[in-house]
Amino acid sequence: MTHGIGFDRDKYIQLQSEHINERREQIGGKLYLEMGGKLFDDYHASRVLPGFTPDNKIAMLENIKEDVEIVVCLNARDLERGKVRADLSIPYEEDALRLVDVFRDRGFRVNNVVLTQLEDSNHMAVAFAERLERLGLNVARHRVIPGYPTNTELVVSDGGFGLNDYVETSRDLVVVTAPGPGSGKLATCLSQVYHEFRRGVPAGYAKFETFPIWNLPLEHPVNLAYEAATADLDDINVIDPFHLQAYGKQVTSYNRDVEVFPLLKTLLEKLYGHSPYQSPTDMGVNMVGHCISDDELCREAAKQEIVRRYYKALVDERREDTDDTVSSRVAIVMSKVGASTKDRRVVAAANEVEERTGEPGSALELADGTIITGKTSELLGCSAAMLLNALKHLAGLDDDIHLLSPKSIEPIQTLKVDHLGSQNPRLHTDEVLIALSVSAAESEDARAALKQLKNLAGCDVHTTTILGSVDEGIFRNLGVLVTSEPKYWRKALYRKR
């Protein structure tokens, strides 16, 4: 568990907004800004750059809000695949709606959604487009372009970008964002630049991608943590070969930017006679690397994130009964930074509980390094027991104090099993917290324990079995960073999610 501040949030907000305005002046017209990563809930960045808050990027954009219009992209194939945003456990299409709501709530203009790689045979995407229109949003349909991005002659023509719908916008700074990677943000930006040129409107493109950080070494743990996070896409960090050739300097980029750069350069040269960019790095505006205040702290935080990503990959493969392709990729990244599962202290502690009791176990590391464990009993699941134990410790209560009496737990178990059809009588984390809240009406100890919930944010947890969706959701809402062993507590073919 990493504690401390390794990133200067205020410096970042100032530097980044200034640099975007500088790029706008250089372009001298409409700027399409591809915004990679999460705009207002970038939890990955907040984990690997301690001090970077999840809303850091949107806070920066609020400095120039009156000039900004936001366009949300969604890959139609992700709808067909049922892709889910892992940190929130919601499908990409629902996250697209959530994004629109949150942007609007913060005062940003957002009226357009682009469905990329759309085919008429994709009935889910076609139906979603109709749903968006019923909700009052404008939907642009972008088709699959054969040979994209390598066949530049076709792509930059009426038979390529020319077939895409044009997105009507009214501001000079258009931020293009998406629920996740691979959504078609770059293609949308380039398509818009093409259409603006046909309409006689000067327009340019820039990229705001937090990771990889161009001015950190290729195999810096923070950059490798990004590689681990996108292992399912097979993204890899690379030295920008175009930048090296143009300037003789080694900087970090990643494979998809390098692959698509010839298309960008060709597009700009074809439209305007020249390209202002000689490399993928040139087109970026990322100032994150200039705001790291404690490199060692960020390195350690990134190593911990890579280990978490490894466990996540293992669990995903077990849940979906897929091969070990993704976890193997993350394992390679983990070895590059010299990390292992042993570096996550809660792993050994949780496994020791299971070895000792023969039942699922869990462990939590508090901010001061104290390890709190939980075991499975007739009344409580191990996660619920661990949660109560942690709250007691934080509240300074004796271990032998019962925050919940067996008499208060048994009626809840009866309700679960006899009336609600549950096969597991043990209380989950949500049920324990509700019971604790009820007890707080009369118990000062329970009230003291509840007040400590805020101190669990950022704590690491490990469980020896895969968590159910309820426990996952509770830990996520508390800000707890959970990993699990890739196995279930009971054998079954059907798993409720």
From Swiss-Prot:
Pfam families, per the entry: DUF1846, DUF1846_C
Disulfide bonds: none
Protein family according to the UniProt entry: Belongs to the UPF0371 family.
Name assigned to this protein: UPF0371 protein cu0538
Native source species: Corynebacterium urealyticum (strain ATCC 43042 / DSM 7109)
